[in-house]
Amino acid sequence: GLYEVVVGVLGGGQLGRMMCQAASQMAIKVMVLDPQENCPASSLSYHHMVGSFDESTKVEEFAKRCGVLTVEIEHVDVDTLEKLEKQGVDCQPKASTVRIIQDKYQQKVALLPAWIPLPEFMKIDDLKAKKWDSLDIHFMIKSRRLAYDGRGNFVAKSEEELSSAVDALGGFDRGLYAEKWAPFVKELAVIVARGRDNSISCYPVVELFTGHICHIVKSPANVNWKTRELAIEVAFNAVKSLEVPGVFAVELFLTKEGEILLNEVAPRPHNSGHHTIESCHTSQFEQHLPAVVGLPLGDPSMKTPAAIMYNILGEEEGEHGFQLAHQLMKRAMTIPGASVHWYDKPEMRKQRKMCHITIVGSSLSSIESNLAILLEGKGLHDKTAVCSTLLGFIMGSDSDLPVMKSAAEMMEMFGVPHEVRIVSAHRTPELMFCYASSAHERGYQVIIAGAGGAAHLPGMVASLTPLPVVGVPVRASTLDGLDSLLSIVQMPRGVPVATVAVNNATNAGLLAVRMLGVANDNLLSRMSQYQEDQKEAVLREGDKLEKHGWESYLKNS
């Protein structure tokens, strides 16, 4: 195989299962230690040892058969890992790192020297009011250990709620800490891989939509580039400070002021990275195994423009719960770009993660539409359909519409949903600014802008959006459209506008379809057919001319 030493994984849940799937593709042998005989990873692993990953004797016995020991869950027996490391066992991540991350309070203390932005927090062991002054009234009471999927957290919005929060979490003896409420507007996450050579690779920033349990993940996150860069910087520095190889999930808060705050770190593959199996050149599981054994890291970039991951959670107990989950899986099979990952858990419980569905597509808006169709229970059988608005048409005045309608007709012919609006660069500059600067966030991929006379609209829009802009010079009442053409085509370096001929909105539409076709095989196929139809039309005209002669041809044309 690629790597002869056996990798041992403490835990055989769905993360262990997907590690085994990735390992089989790379010819890496993976053993799992899990107490459940028919755990999700059991049937796919090189070997499954039945036993608890927090039982010292079992972990020691397991480690004897492994060259590298890693985890799919951080709640393991760290004392045993430290003992094994002293005996020469290669544990990745290191026991010291797992110990820090197990305790969410110590995790934040450890990150402070690296200047990682964090919500205000403090250790608590009683209800003395003076200790709470720095955190104001609105705060989170959190369990330091064994807290995940929203468990172990309690919001306290008043002093009266504080006592209830402590009681709900099992009292101070369990180990609690307080964190000032972070008024976030989005929850983000970054999967970060670190190799044994200290190389670090970051996956694209994703957006989480949760009800405590991670439920929906969108990639890339619908945030501006500055926010993405800041999120990646925080995640990179957090993992760099931990100084151990492997894949880490860094969960973040985005505040209304645009600040990024670190929520927590997991030292393993994570639910927020499941989409990478279909959406990225190297999945988080294909990344974790090479990282811990010392092989090169892969490419974390996306190979599809957008992806969304949806967790199927148990809705009911027992057989009925399985039936409901299977119905949703069957519907997913009718959705273009959808992939189903069943975890093969033997028992159905409410709110238990049983499966995830990943949908990839040409834009976030298109995959959001497909997810809505899935959740509404409607099968999508026309797999050639484009599901959402991909293109925006704007013009400076309704007098431009007779010209611009030709581009709209092209969109209708190719089946590309589009939005047509009047936006004037001179009379509605605020509207133009909002439209152009947010177009990519609304899922648009191309903008066609038509203007006559001064014709500043296409260029101004191009200066405000990262999307490609196609400019249509509209013939005005003077100068026969030459003024419009020169205004649009003479853009300064760094602000490109793809400009077509005067009044040739048809070509603008066709060019936009070709741009969209780069990431849409259906549109690319339709464009190829359009070109073939054009060729056939010219050949028919040529045959007709040769057959009837030019005089007859002109009379009948």
Curated annotation (Swiss-Prot):
Residues 108-293 form the ATP-grasp domain. ATP binds at residues 132-189. Its main location: plastid. Residues 387-557 are annotated as: AIR carboxylase catalytic subunit. This is Phosphoribosylaminoimidazole carboxylase, chloroplastic. GO terms for cellular component: chloroplast. Its EC number is 4.1.1.21. InterPro entries: Ade2_fungi/plant, ATP-grasp, ATP-grasp_carboxylate-amine, ATP_grasp_subdomain_1, PreATP-grasp_dom_sf, PurE_ClassI, PurE_dom, PurK. NCBIfam families: PRK06019.1-5 (NF004679), purE (TIGR01162), purK (TIGR01161). Keywords: ATP-binding, Chloroplast, Decarboxylase, Lyase, Nucleotide-binding, Plastid, Purine biosynthesis, Transit peptide. The gene is PURKE. It comes from the Eukaryota. GO terms for molecular function: ATP binding; metal ion binding; phosphoribosylaminoimidazole carboxylase activity. It catalyses: 5-amino-1-(5-phospho-D-ribosyl)imidazole-4-carboxylate + H(+) = 5-amino-1-(5-phospho-beta-D-ribosyl)imidazole + CO2. GO terms for biological process: 'de novo' IMP biosynthetic process. Pfam families: AIRC, ATP-grasp, PurK_C, RS_preATP-grasp-like. Pathway: Purine metabolism; IMP biosynthesis via de novo pathway; 5-amino-1-(5-phospho-D-ribosyl)imidazole-4-carboxylate from 5-amino-1-(5-phospho-D-ribosyl)imidazole (carboxylase route): step 1/1. It is found in: Plastid, Chloroplast. In the C-terminal section; belongs to the AIR carboxylase family. Class I subfamily. SMART domains: AIRC.
